Swiss-Prot record:
A GO term for molecular function: structural constituent of chromatin
GO CC, alphabetical: chromosome; cytosol
Source domain of life: Bacteria
Name of this protein: Integration host factor subunit beta
InterPro entries named in the record: Hist_DNA-bd, IHF-like_DNA-bd_dom_sf, IHF_beta
Record-linked CDD domains: IHF_B
Keyword hit for Lyase: no
Membership in a protein family: Belongs to the bacterial histone-like protein family.
Biological source species: Paraburkholderia xenovorans (strain LB400)
Reported function: This protein is one of the two subunits of integration host factor, a specific DNA-binding protein that functions in genetic recombination as well as in transcriptional and translational control.
Record's keyword terms, sorted: DNA recombination, DNA-binding, Transcription, Transcription regulation, Translation regulation
Region of interest (Disordered), ranges: 82-107
Length: 107
């Protein structure tokens, strides 16, 4: 599902929301989450999962063109850990055959 599909589904599910307002709501939520992660905070959405940061230590890598050793500095990368309810919901559907995505399935 893309951001635009999420906006469309939100506007469909809540007819009182204009598409523009649904887009604003999704953008605001994603901006707030991005800002929280950028500031080193953890985000927890009960039943869905949590977003946090994992530290990747510095290491010695290789330049693929020249083969020269280069130092890759440490960095922090976003990480998502699914919650129990989400894991169970996905697991229940794991035995079903995959089908083409239909945006109306989740309504």
């Amino acid at each position: 599902m893309t951001k635009s599909e999420l906006v469309a589904q939100l506007a469909t599910r809540f007819p009182q929301l204009v598409l523009k307002d649904a887009d604003f709501a999704v953008k605001t939520m994603l901006d707030a989450m991005s800002e929280a992660l950028a500031n080193g905070h953890r985000i927890e959405i009960r039943g869905f999962g949590s977003f946090g940061l994992n530290r990747r230590p510095s290491r010695v890598g290789r330049n693929p063109k020249s083969g020269e050793k280069v130092l890759v500095p440490e960095k922090y990368v976003p990480h998502f850990k699914p919650g129990k309810e989400l894991r169970e919901r996905v697991d229940r559907r794991a035995g079903e055959p995959l089908k083409a995505e239909d945006p109306d399935d989740d309504l």
